[in-house]
Amino acid sequence: MRQAETARKTNETNISLTLEIDGEGKADIQTDVPFMTHMLDLFTKHGHFNLTVDAKGDTDVDDHHTTEDIGIVLGQMFKEALGDKKGIKRYGSSFVPMDETLAQVVVDLSNRPHLEMRAAFPSQKVGTFDTELVHEFLWKFALEARINLHVIVHYGTNTHHMIEAIFKAMARALDEATTIDPRVKGIPSTKGML
């Protein structure tokens, strides 16, 4: 089974996380950042992962450390759960519409971390959540999972819709990229390693 779990405690956050890549979309997400809880819940559902997260942090300061550290831990567990990556499709892409918004996410599980993001959010906040933290979360996730992640919001006017479409598209792209393809023998690279 492709799964991983960890607990990470710092002076700023305390996070426990379990991930099953080949799941059923079951989520048990408990964080001090309600908007991230919502995004992780739908990420799990649309990626067909099983994910549990218990994250507490210094949200009396702001949501930055908790959001960033969830991205770090989720990325680390994604990398660990994927193991040697034998037989995976490696690449995945998805377009997701949400009302007036269209988001696109493309991933390569290449072991070369990079985030390219094109999204101009009209609002600086969704509720109490600072929208600049979306980039922070995605970058830390890509860095720790060691994936190449491209995120484009082609258009949209509602910031909540734009971010939600990103998380859904990322989930669907990762679901595709992590799928075992019976035609792929070994590592999906001419170098023989990822």
Swiss-Prot record:
Instruction: Name the PROSITE patterns for this protein.
Output: IGP_DEHYDRATASE_1, IGP_DEHYDRATASE_2
**InterPro entries listed in its UniProt record:** IGPD_sf, ImidazoleglycerolP_deHydtase, ImidazoleglycerP_deHydtase_CS, Ribosomal_Su5_D2-typ_SF
Q: Name one GO molecular function term.
A: imidazoleglycerol-phosphate dehydratase activity
| Cell compartment(s), UniProt | Cytoplasm
Protein name (record):
Imidazoleglycerol-phosphate dehydratase
Which keywords describe this protein according to UniProt?
Amino-acid biosynthesis, Cytoplasm, Histidine biosynthesis, Lyase
Where mainly found?
cytoplasm
- Biological process GO annotation list? L-histidine biosynthetic process
**Pathway participation:** Amino-acid biosynthesis; L-histidine biosynthesis; L-histidine from 5-phospho-alpha-D-ribose 1-diphosphate: step 6/9
> What family is this protein classified in?
Belongs to the imidazoleglycerol-phosphate dehydratase family.
Which NCBIfam families does its entry note? PRK00951.1-2, PRK00951.2-1, PRK00951.2-4, PRK00951.2-5
Against CDD domains, the record matches this protein to: IGPD (cd07914)
Q: Gene of origin?
A: hisB
Cellular component per GO, a single term: cytoplasm
State the organism of origin: Bacillus pumilus (strain SAFR-032)
User: Does the record bear Disulfide bond in its keywords?
Assistant: no
One protein family per Pfam: IGPD
Q: What does the record give as EC number? A: 4.2.1.19
Which catalysed reactions does the entry list for this protein?
Answer: D-erythro-1-(imidazol-4-yl)glycerol 3-phosphate = 3-(imidazol-4-yl)-2-oxopropyl phosphate + H2O
